[in-house]
Curated annotation (Swiss-Prot):
It holds the Pfam family Ank_2. This is Putative ankyrin repeat protein FPV243. InterPro entries: Ankyrin_rpt, Ankyrin_rpt-contain_sf, PRANC_domain. Keywords: ANK repeat. It comes from Fowlpox virus (strain NVSL) (FPV). It comes from the Viruses. SUPFAM superfamilies: Ankyrin repeat. ANK repeats lie at residues 25-54.
Length: 262
């Protein structure tokens, strides 16, 4: 599994391949890619929720064993191994920040402890911690009663309703471009939030134009209130509103044509 064939991996994932499927040796595509130092495949699998804390047939963290093997066989890690480490460590950190219970998982603890025990890897881990702290202090919106919205919220996809309302602020992409280790994760989260922004505003538009029986009640609400209400819906519900509103308009148009003909 090499960088030159990463588009095949992407094709298979798009058509429903299991990103965590194991071969006869108990290894998943992610760890095959790590063993072959395929940066493109590693990024692809992690973006598609590959389990970075997967264990091998002995019940130990596969990630730790791969890096430990490379450390012993090469008397340290070379530049390619460190490039892979700079990809996986941020994902490992985010998993621990999003889910506190993960910190008690045996494989996660093995991975973290190993990365902190090797100087080359510890430097990357420390760099990632400093970048996390900068994100915590990068305020995107100040709130009256505290709980300011920061780049850290985008990293962890917290306070999604407020993020949707400010996602078009050019400051966000500017601050994202200044990141190093977490840039890819934050950039993908921004794309997700922008997509949700489009769905929310699309749902609002079709309600205003096509849901005739609710238009009067909906239109008297301030725009901010309407958006806040729609923020409580998930993407499937927003898609349903959009599609059903268009279908409702189509049926109403057909009825009017029928009335004219009669």
């Amino acid at each position: 599994m090499f960088d030159r064939t990463w588009h095949i991996s992407r094709f298979l994932l798009e058509y429903g391949a299991d990103v965590n499927i194991k071969n006869r040796y108990g290894s998943t595509p992610l760890f095959e890619a790590i063993c072959n130092c395929s940066c493109k495949n590693v990024k692809l699998f992690l973006e598609n929720n590959a389990d970075i804390n997967e264990v091998d047939l002995d019940g130990d963290a596969t990630l730790m064993k791969i890096f430990n093997y490379n450390c012993r066989i090469h008397s340290g890690l070379n530049s390619v191994h460190l490039r892979i480490a700079r990809i996986v460590i941020p994902y490992l950190k985010v998993i621990g920040l999003k889910n506190k219970h993960v910190k008690n998982v045996h494989a996660y603890k093995q991975n973290i402890n190993f990365f902190n025990s090797v100087k080359q890897l510890r430097l990357i881990s420390d760099e990632s911690d400093r970048e996390i702290n900068r994100m915590k202090n990068t305020i995107l919106r100040k709130n009256k009663f505290g709980n300011d919205i920061t780049m850290y919220d985008i990293l962890l996809e917290k306070n999604m309703n407020q993020l949707v309302q400010i996602i078009k602020n050019p400051l966000i992409k500017k601050r994202c471009s200044e990141l190093i280790l977490f840039k890819r994760i934050v950039k993908n989260n921004i794309i997700y939030i922008e997509n949700r922004y489009q769905k929310i505003h699309g749902a609002n538009t079709v309600i205003e134009f096509y849901q005739y029986e609710y238009t009067d009640k909906w239109m008297i609400l301030p725009q901010e209130i309407k958006i806040n209400i729609l923020c409580y819906l998930d993407n499937k519900e927003l898609d349903y509103i959009y599609e059903s509103s268009l279908e409702n308009n189509k049926n109403n148009t057909s009825d009017k044509k029928y009335d004219v003909c009669c």
